[in-house]
Regions:
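Short loop/turn segments at strand-loop or loop-helix junctions that form parts
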Residues: 1, 107-112, 173-180
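A general structural motif
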Residues: 39, 61, 168-170
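C-terminal domain-boundary segment and adjacent tail
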Residues: 133-234
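Flexible glycine/acidic-rich beta-alpha junction loops that bind and position SAM and/or redox cofactors
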Residues: 1-3, 74-78, 179-184
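Metal-dependent polysaccharide deacetylase catalytic core of the NodB/CE4 family, i.e.
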Residues: 1-44, 48, 113
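Active-site-adjacent pocket scaffolds in enzyme catalytic domains
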Residues: 44-164
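The substrate-binding groove and active-site-proximal loops of carbohydrate-active enzymes
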Residues: 8-20, 38-44, 83, 142-151, ...
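Alpha-helical structural signal in soluble globular domains
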Residues: 30, 34, 56-60, 203-207, ...
Length: 234
């Protein structure tokens, strides 16, 4: 490996193939030992996937992955070795697909473009802001995730509404366990913020439950795996 002058955090994909394989194998064996069941789904740290990583997951019997974030470019996230960075998923499929050359089914994160036009009233400043908002809405410059951020309940409900309108058959929700306790993360860092999170989740899940039901990545992957899915070589 050739190290960068001021390295960032390492991506697993930066290591040689054999080390990637052995790490996945070791973690899988430890998981089985502790929980007495075999893991079949995976998500990469920092969303850092590439072809080699997929191949090593496949060799270790992983069937489903959910690391792809459509519309998102992670190349600004530096790796540890020279010229290493995160992947660019801007043109990846937003629907479930098979990863070419492997037995893995990719279930991408729920990411949407925000085309809403929010009108501001009053004064020249608001007029300029309205023009800017309109351009952003038309071009779809803002991406929305189904991921709580403390002040984005309206965005989360918008995603659910868009999924319903476009007859999307799944929503991929993400929340780290560290985000469910005060002080475990910079966003929900107080008891009050945690309480607000749970209140928002109750509203969100109530809305989601109108058309969706909870299911694991493995169960959903097994269900859609019976279909004739698109094969992607990215």
């Amino acid at each position: 490996m050739r190290f960068a002058p001021s390295p960032g955090y390492v991506f697993l994909k930066e290591y040689p193939d054999e080390i990637i394989f052995q790490k996945i194998k070791t973690l899988k064996e430890e998981y089985i030992r502790r929980f007495e069941c075999e893991p079949v789904s995976h998500r990469a740290a920092r969303w850092g996937m590439n072809r080699t990583y997929f191949e090593q997951l496949d060799k270790n019997g992983i069937l489903y992955d959910c690391s792809v974030t459509p519309l998102i470019d992670w190349t600004s996230a530096r790796g540890y070795t020279e010229n290493s960075c995160g992947p660019d998923y801007t043109d990846h499929p937003r629907k479930v697909y098979r990863v070419k050359g492997t037995g893995i089914i990719e279930i991408p994160m729920s990411v949407y473009m925000d085309h809403r036009f929010i009108l501001n009233e009053g004064g020249n400043t608001s007029k300029k802001r309205n023009i800017k908002n309109f351009v952003r809405a038309v071009k779809g410059k803002k991406t929305l995730w189904l991921r709580p951020a403390g002040d984005n309940l309206i965005d989360l409900l918008y995603i659910v509404d868009q999924a319903r309108k476009h007859h999307v058959d799944y929503l991929m929700f993400i929340l780290h366990s560290s985000e469910m306790m005060p002080g475990g993360n910079p966003v929900f860092n107080t008891p009050e913020r945690i309480e607000m999170l749970y209140e928002n989740l109750e509203i969100l899940f109530r809305e989601i439950s109108r058309d969706f039901e909870g299911i694991s990545v493995a169960d959903y992957g097994s269900m859609v795996g019976q279909k004739n899915l698109y094969v992607c070589s990215k």
